[in-house]
């Protein structure tokens, strides 16, 4: 299985992220990312949700939950 670093520009569009992570879950490849990439993803996901009218606290919680689920489902994906 090959590995690929997924930057925020790949992970941030929701539909694109869902498709790519579904492929990873089916072991087509191993996703890799850094803590910085996940932090950037969380920031941009929060901003997007706020821009769509979600209250800031709820937006932050949803973005945090997204990153937490990614870490849970792909625990060996964080690289330095």
Locate predicted features.
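Active-site-proximal, substrate-binding regions of enzyme catalytic domains
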Residues: 3-4, 8-80
């Amino acid at each position: 299985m090959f590995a690929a670093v997924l930057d925020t520009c790949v992970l941030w569009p929701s539909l694109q992220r869902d498709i790519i992570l579904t492929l990873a879950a089916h072991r087509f490849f191993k996703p890799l990312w850094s803590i910085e990439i996940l932090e950037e993803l969380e920031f941009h996901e929060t901003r997007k949700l706020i821009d769509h009218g979600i209250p800031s606290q709820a937006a932050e919680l949803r973005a945090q939950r997204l990153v937490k689920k990614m870490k849970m489902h792909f625990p060996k994906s964080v690289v330095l």
